[in-house]
Amino acid sequence: MVEFKKANIKMASQNASNIVFRKDYTAPDHQIESIDLSFDLIPTCTEVTSKIIAVPQEDRKSDDLILDGDDLTLVSIKIAGEDSFPGQYDMRPGKLIIHNIKERTEIEIVTRINPRNNLELSGLYMSKNNYITQCESEGFRRITYFPDRPDILAKYRVVIRAPKDYKDLLSNGNLVEQGELLDGRNYAIWEDPFPKPSYLFALVAGNFVAQEQKVTLSDGREALLQIWTEPANKGKTEFAMQSLVKAIKWDEERFGLDLDLDRFMIVATDDFNFGAMENKGLNIFNSKYVLADENVATDQDFANIEAVIGHEYFHNWTGDRVTCRDWFQLSLKEGLTVFREQEFSADMLGDESSRAVKRIDDVRVLRNSQFPEDAGPMAHPIRPESYRSINNFYTTTVYEKGAEVVRMYQTLFGKDGFRRGLLEYINRYDGTAATCDDFLNAMAESNYEDLSQFELWYSQAGTPRISVETKWDEIAKTFTLTLRQNNRTFPGKPAPKPLMIPVKIGILDDAGNDIPLQLEGEDSPDGTSRLLILDEAVQSWTFRNVSTKPLLSIGRGFSAPVIFNTEYTREQLAFLARHDSD
């Protein structure tokens, strides 16, 4: 269940003039060490004061600090505590360029924005009378001037001031202070101890009610969980709260990943445009994915809530603590987190048969939504090479196929090997922005495997088709399986190369029993399922001691996102449906 994000995104025009290429990525010339934000909330004229500490990088190509900005009214700039003067900065469409930042420098920028008239619902906007933010992927530049790119990670301190009828003022991290000002307005101060990219910033102001629960984490710390909702929806958050508790415990037990904040919040509102968003410590959801009335909600409603709550919480480590270097790496956080969500939902079902049904449901989504995308004119790899608008990247390929690519690591290395690789990835890149190659290398090195060919899954589009041929030699008692992979070609693109494809198979005898599998060259059988690695255009495997006419069971567990071209008869398919242990 990952449609919640992209379903409500306004798809960008394909006539945009600027194309961004992955190959053109360059590291930023300046990092932002910290940012202090101050908001004076007024519906049509909110004033935002931003104090950033800019740190030039040793390998920089320019001393100019380039800040992004969209639909902002610039009020003032101070550089190193002094009012700026002409020549110190330039304004260009969508950019504020501050010259000669050669050393660690504090820069204060005051802007004004109009949340009431922000109809793009990107940045800070008003829904009914509530203030809400949506900053993924490039919404923060509609709040203040800032290098709005995911490889800029800064620590945030946020002060919110609002009229007295706004009692709930929320932002990322931990609440430091709150109260009433001398002029009667309310205020709150929040500090996030962890550096994060600007797309994970969040602010919510309004009048809500909160369901609260405290949980004890595996290290003995106590954390406060809060689900905030509009007063009319009070009493409909219990299932969401228990789903959050389960997600926290599951991530502790399955991957050893603890909740890292003293407080974790979810805000549910009827008018949130993105469906659900993983802002660090302050997730914002459309009410559809939080609220459930047991008298009218369906089983699917409850399943969706559990999945989406889990998905956004799991981003805390795979997306927040380790984020993506650039938007070409979107599947690094989304594919990985969809996979984690799928595993969580399956584990919550308990028994193996229920897990199998969940796996079938996930594959059905892939086959019905992503396979057609891979077969059509909009086919693209899970890590595209170019884009006109990042909003066009929120696709079933990036999400669902990306999750299947992540799942193949677990298929190759098992649950223990996958956990080992994931924790190595997090240990290496915690607090930084990473790439798909970084994840692959962590998996490869943790499991002592060469995955250089596996990297093609990130760069080649299309669904591989595998032709299947079988031959049984009754006299020699051998069974030979031949697989041929055919990958889609695209005009103007290099010819596709053979992929590394894990293919899990079994063989059934004429009574429907699994046959012990013994490959040529092996001294004895080893189990009744075998993971074969198809990494050439054509490969064959021969199994010994197959004394009865066999029937192949291929693609067990849906071990790879491929299409098998087989010659099963209807009777053989019915036989597999009755007897296959998978």
Please place each PLM-identified region on the residue numbering.
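Hydrophobic alpha-helical and helix-loop surface patches within well-folded domains
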Residues: W190, R221-I475, L481-L483
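N-terminal, polar/Ser/Thr-rich
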Residues: V2-E47, Y125-Q134, F146, P150, ...
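Short, hydrophobic/aromatic-enriched beta-strand segments in well-ordered soluble domains
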Residues: V48-A54, G69, I101-L119, Y156-K164, ...
